[in-house]
Amino acid sequence: MRQTLACLSAPALLVAATALSGCMQTGDGFDEPPAMRWDHRPEAAEWTQAAISALASDGAVLATTVPADIETFCPNYAEASLEERQAFWSGLFSALAQFESTWNPKASGGGGAWIGLLQIAPSTARAYSCDATSTSGLKDGAANLSCAVKIAARQVPRDNAIVDNGAPGWEGLARDWAPMRSSTKVKAMAAWTSKQSYCVKPGSRA
């Protein structure tokens, strides 16, 4: 599967990713919608759809990237389908949102410097050409997630890492999100994502 994904041209990848994300939203690829850490929230379906849609467009590169430290977060990722990889990235953002905002889309941290589900600064949103660049815009959960995917799509391939490729300094998502610099929080996030159906190796599934 890795070779197939790697050989797709950018337009073909976008078409494939969009088609597969549509299957996920209707449940065609899973017996039930893929699990997210925010599933207890009333906005859960909207947020998951927003994340998957962003991963099929601006963030399509994430599902074709195999980070050096992916085994920690998603043991089956290297062999996973494009759809399962998208589910993983969405799941990881849902886990990160717990530590950034406790899933509160209106959260404001750092004296108003960081906004929303993933605590994104308006200046950062502008730097990454996100659709939402204002405080009010970033308090929309779906828009905040779409922006987060754009940021990740730049940083993860740049370092070939979610948080660690063996080089010194902050890498991947740790460049922009403080919880990814905490070994305790990273361990908690990885413990959750790695046991989800889209990350468990087939032979290990119950």
Model-inferred region functions:
Residues 112-131:
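Substrate-binding/active-site groove segments that recognize
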Residues 87, 112-115, 139:
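Residues at secondary-structure transition points
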Residues 65-82, 112-117, 168-177:
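Acidic helix-start/capping segments at beta-turn-to-alpha-helix junctions
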